[in-house]
Amino acid sequence: TIHFLKNLPLVAFFILLFSSCHDEIPIIDAYENTNQTLFVYMPWTGTKNTSENNLKAYFDKNIAAMRQNIEQNKGVKQTDIIVFVAENQTRSVIFRMKYNTTRQRCELDTLKRNAGFVSVSESNLRNLFNQVVSYSNTGKYSLLIGCHGSGWTPRGSDSTMPKALSRAFGGSDIDMQYNISDLRNAIAQSQMKKVSFICFDDCYMANVETAYALKDVTEMLVASTSEVMAEGIPYDKVFSYILGQTDYEKWVDGFY
């Protein structure tokens, strides 16, 4: 009995230790609720057979800048951000960009590896839009496109032009490029039907011809009349203006 009493403080210590371990409250990750969807579309920007002029490295920087802005502003303004990135001519990934309010950080949640949708066709683009809706059925959609482009001229029309690290709609050769009509029909025939805005982070897409072709499938068109350098929009500065209730004035002013 005396021996037990001498060790009683030690026994009590271990009881308290194990009791405190059981009483630890687990961290529960919480995320913002969302009521609208931003689809960030970054297709393959090289050629069908090579990586020439591809912008993948710049897209990676764009995504990092978006994450930085989200963390600085501590949220996504109730916007479900779905991102498609083509890694090469055959492989792509779809992921969700979301804000962990518990840990106060932006996280990437992979939705589909080897996602496909890299080949260029109107039906392929329509199926991709429907895939996005299946991931994020909010009923309100916006579209941000980063790639190469030739404005309103048909696919392949810039094949004789000097190639520089700038943007346009699609890849670097005719096999990887979309006509504006492909985009219009893909939106109209998909479950999206119409989007709040289309932003071309590309060259030469702000013109009457493009705006007229897309007038029935978008409320707003955000684009440039001239070249857009490979770095694209400074998302680290303006991404918060794109999310939620879009502030077009601050968005555009922040770019220039």
Segments predicted by a language model, with ranges:
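A short, glycine/acidic-enriched catalytic loop
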Residues: 150-189
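Short, solvent-exposed loop/turn and secondary-structure capping segments
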Residues: 50-52, 93-95, 153-158, 210-211, ...
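Structural recognition of the beta-strand scaffold that forms the well-ordered cores
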Residues: 37-42, 80-85, 141-145, 196-200, ...
